[in-house]
A protein has these predicted regions:
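Domain-level signal for soluble alpha/beta catalytic cores
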Residues: 1-199
């Protein structure tokens, strides 16, 4: 499926501030909506709501986009191949957005361990028909106290992971935290291999 015949201007929204707390989200969703209006008015063709940890946050963001008629993607951050960071099953998230959100052009996962992605893709596919986009971390763990990444990268090569994601049904594949140029090259090789097999 080709989503765009031309180059898109994509606006990414992943805010790390006092605005994004469970308390504000629960008590003042209108405040969050107001903040997002400026992003839509800035001229992006599509808005990417990324690293979304909560289903409620995703629903607020979707409501804003639908209200103003803007196309958008939603990408969740996940703790395992079953749940997003707040603990909601990814299957429930996919079911929530399966119908009634005509401007939602892609749903997916980012800022998540590479080894969880294939399982997450399958669970999303089982519960909705929206194209899936994934861009995981390269595999290291983040120490929030020391603010450093540590540990080894994932067992498989990023190229093999990317290929597996494509085989599983992902329409878009990329990289998030600790991915660099070589990871992009690996995704390109995976895409070439996958495309050759589709001929």
């Amino acid at each position: 499926m080709t989503l765009c015949p031309h180059h898109w201007k994509i606006g990414g929204v992943s805010l790390n501030s006092k605005l994004w707390t469970a308390k504000i989200l629960a008590e003042q969703p209108e405040l969050i909506k107001q903040v997002h209006k400026n992003y839509f008015k800035a001229g992006a063709d599509i808005i990417l709501f990324e690293t979304v940890p909560s289903l409620k946050e995703a629903k607020v963001e979707a409501e804003i986009a639908e209200e103003y008629g803007y196309d958008y993607w939603i990408s969740f951050s996940c703790l395992s191949e079953n749940i997003i960071c707040e603990g909601t099953p990814i299957a429930e998230c996919a079911t929530t957005f399966a119908k009634g959100y005509p401007h939602l052009k892609m749903i997916g996962v980012n800022c998540t361990k590479s080894e969880y992605i294939t399982g997450l893709i399958h669970k999303i596919k089982e519960n909705c028909d929206i194209p899936i986009g994934v861009y995981p971390n390269s595999g290291e763990e983040y120490d929030a106290v020391k603010k450093v990444w540590f540990g080894k990268q994932s067992a498989l090569s990023f190229e093999q992971y990317a290929y597996n994601y494509m085989k599983s049904g992902a329409s878009a594949v990329g990289g998030c935290c600790t991915t660099v140029a070589k990871h992009v090259e690996e995704v390109v090789r995976a895409k070439k291999r996958f495309s050759e097999e589709q001929k």
